[in-house]
From Swiss-Prot:
It comes from Amborella trichopoda. It comes from the Eukaryota. This is Cytochrome b6-f complex subunit 5. Coiled coil: none annotated. SUPFAM superfamilies: PetG subunit of the cytochrome b6f complex. GO terms for cellular component: chloroplast thylakoid membrane; cytochrome b6f complex. GO terms for molecular function: electron transporter, transferring electrons within cytochrome b6/f complex of photosystem II activity. It holds the Pfam family PetG. It is found in: Plastid, Chloroplast thylakoid membrane.
Amino acid sequence: MIEVFPFGIVLGLIPITLAGLFVTAYLQYRRGDQLDL
């Protein structure tokens, strides 16, 4: 039997992690743009 609770936690963390990485990369990109100007 599949452990539903940990599986749900993992499925919930994956999009949050991806979103966090995307936001961090975007902020660093914006910050780099401002420094170049």
